[in-house]
Design a protein with these regions (language model features):
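The AdoMet/dcAdoMet-binding core of the Class I SAM-like
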Residues: 2-137, 154
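C-terminal lobe and adjacent flexible extensions of AdoMet/dcAdoMet transferase-like proteins
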Residues: 3-9, 33, 178-323
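Intrinsically disordered, low-complexity regions enriched in proline, serine, glycine
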Residues: 13-14, 33, 58-59, 118-119, ...
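Beta-strand cores of modular interaction/reader domains in eukaryotic scaffold and signaling proteins
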Residues: 20-23, 47-48, 107, 145-149, ...
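Composition- and surface-driven signal marking solvent-exposed, interaction-prone regions
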Residues: 34-37, 161-162, 266
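Anionic group-transfer/hydrolysis microenvironments
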Residues: 111, 151, 194
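Conserved Class I SAM-dependent methyltransferase catalytic core
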Residues: 119-174
């Protein structure tokens, strides 16, 4: 979150005022913690909502106990049902009525344990992805920002969601932060300056009325029944090719490393390089870090500056990439 805020200047316009933020599927609270560190403003109000579940594989607030005790401006929201379930209609209506048009920044960091079948992670996440977007639209202030974690962008439902966001925000970015593992499909959609639709209230009422249908299906396969803009689709294909190639190269590098006769030596060298890059990452974003003078620095391995592709939007439905 620190990297995203820095590279896309998400917080600059709030430097001289207080903020209200809402964090969906937030447990154990990493995004909130990052923002409280960056802002250092006790007058800000942070709201976190995540599924309350007894299973250990469901991220909760247990690891954040000390942090929550030390930050009175962080509020845990559980919704109407008391369990923070984003798939429940009652909770959507509750958040819409309580927080409508009030949140400057909304984040959505939801995910599942995909280790059983990584090939279906995009489909499995489709309902949660859709739910997070709907909750964001229910609470977003006009001109506000939204950060959404996604995985692959291949299925129609995910593409439809990105298209929807591109019509509701002034600019939309796809970003793969340096702190996100290259071999992982994880990436973030950053939406800036929410443009409230003229028919906003009727749109939200219609969505809420039909929201119960989300739980009647295994996956969401489609949102729109029309063909999307060709330029929009072409840009997504380009981004998928770039990020996919990075994944393939990293996975192949890992396989070759494990099969190498000099495996131990190469692993140690790789670890030193990674430590060096982590130190420079912390220095770049002005974060405290342990600087070990015994670490062999590599002068030409500085973390590259982010590059924004497609500086000038060529149509109303466009996305930019931060690579």
């Amino acid at each position: 979150m620190i990297e995203i805020c820095s590279e896309l200047k998400l917080l600059e316009k709030y430097n001289n005022c207080n903020m209200k933020t809402f964090h969906l599927a937030e447990g154990p609270g990493g995004f909130i913690e990052a923002l409280t560190y960056l802002r250092s403003n006790n007058e800000d109000q942070y709201y976190g909502m995540t599924l309350i579940d007894g299973n250990d594989y469901v991220p909760g607030w247990k690891k954040s106990k000390t942090f929550l005790e030390n930050h009175n401006n962080v509020n845990i929201e559980t919704g109407s049902t008391g369990n923070g379930d984003l798939l429940q209609k009652e909770n959507l209506l509750y958040c819409y009525e309580k927080y409508k048009n009030t949140m400057d920044l909304i984040t959505a960091d939801g995910g599942f344990d995909f280790s059983i079948d990584f090939n279906k992670q995009e489909l499995v996440a489709s309902k949660l992805l859709f739910a997070q977007v709907v909750f964001a639209l229910a609470m977003q202030k006009n001109g506000g920002e939204f950060v959404l974690k996604v995985f692959d962008i291949f299925t129609k439902s995910t593409v439809d969601i990105l298209y929807l966001l591109s019509t509701l925000y002034d600019s939309v970015y796809i970003m793969k932060p340096n702190t996100s593992r290259i071999a992982n499909s994880e990436r973030y959609i950053i939406c800036k300056k929410f443009v409230k639709p003229k028919q906003y209230d009727s749109l939200m009422n219609r969505i809420i009325d039909n929201y119960h249908q989300v739980n009647t299906m295994d996956y969401i396969t489609s949102i729109f029944d029309f063909s999307l803009n060709h330029y929009f689709i072409n840009k997504l294909e380009e981004y998928n090719a770039i990020l996919g190639q990075q994944q393939i190269e990293n996975i192949m590098y890992t396989i070759n490393l494990l099969q190498s006769r000099q495996k131990n030596e190469k692993i140690e060298s790789h670890k030193r390089n990674n430590i060096n890059k982590c130190v420079m990452w912390c220095a770049k974003y002005r974060l405290p870090h342990y600087n070990d003078s015994n670490i062999n620095t590599v002068s030409n391995r500085f973390i590259p500056d982010m590059i924004k592709v497609d500086e000038n939007r060529q149509c109303d439905n466009s996305v930019n990439m931060v690579a």
